[in-house]
């Protein structure tokens, strides 16, 4: 995609944000566990339910951006500040998608697993659109990039470590708040779905990326 076509880039990247946000909402609805990066906002929302998942999401992203400033110092570029509007947009999109699915009833484990698998596919497509748009960048991914550059450890290793950190912190908070590592009992944030999303989203992208790229070439 041509870098000089800013409108198209932002449209594609924004479409990616919408799809990823819908994936977050689907994973929460499945009640089998959400993606590692969404675990802290989801757990905090269970304890402080007056504050939405989306609000906790953008708050977490702002903290991640501040951590980048600390790590990079003067090397922190002004262009990185575009993560701030991306954080707000993504947070409110998460809330909107959660609201859209509020009346959906999931009563069987089979249906829960179907939603989990659908979340993997949807998230893979959304992430590819974000990357293809080369406009918005969410703080989770950018923080992993910065950590990789600063530590000189591979991005994949850093990403896995960051995911594990998010899950562990969320599980510890859940244990302290609810006496359970997975959630408040009725609402599950960390379970097999978390592992499925962590392991298989990247693998799914190997299949969906060529299809998304082919579609983008036709449309754009």
Task: Specify the residue positions occupied by each region the protein language model found.
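Core subunits and conserved enzymes of cellular information-processing
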Residues: 2-220
């Amino acid at each position: 995609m041509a870098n000089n076509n800013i409108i198209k880039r932002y449209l594609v990247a924004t479409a990616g944000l919408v799809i990823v946000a819908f994936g977050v909402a689907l994973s929460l609805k499945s009640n089998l566990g959400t993606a590692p990066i969404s675990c802290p906002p989801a757990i905090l929302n269970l304890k402080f339910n007056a504050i939405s998942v989306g609000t906790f999401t953008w708050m977490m992203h702002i903290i991640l951006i501040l951590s980048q400033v600390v790590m990079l110092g003067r090397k922190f570029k002004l262009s990185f500040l575009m993560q701030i509007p991306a954080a707000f947009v993504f947070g409110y999109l998460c809330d909107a998608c959660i609201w859209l699915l509020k009346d959906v009833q999931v009563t069987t484990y089979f249906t829960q697993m179907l939603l989990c698998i659908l979340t993997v596919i949807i998230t893979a497509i959304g992430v590819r659109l974000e990357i293809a748009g080369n406009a918005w960048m969410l703080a989770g991914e950018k923080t992993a990039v910065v950590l990789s550059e600063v530590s000189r450890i591979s991005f994949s290793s850093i990403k896995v470590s960051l995911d594990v950190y998010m899950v562990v912190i969320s599980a510890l908070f859940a244990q302290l708040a609810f006496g359970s590592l997975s959630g408040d009992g009725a609402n599950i944030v960390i379970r097999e779905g978390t592992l499925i999303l962590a392991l298989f989203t990247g693998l799914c992208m190997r299949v969906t990326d060529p299809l998304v790229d082919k579609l983008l070439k036709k449309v754009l």
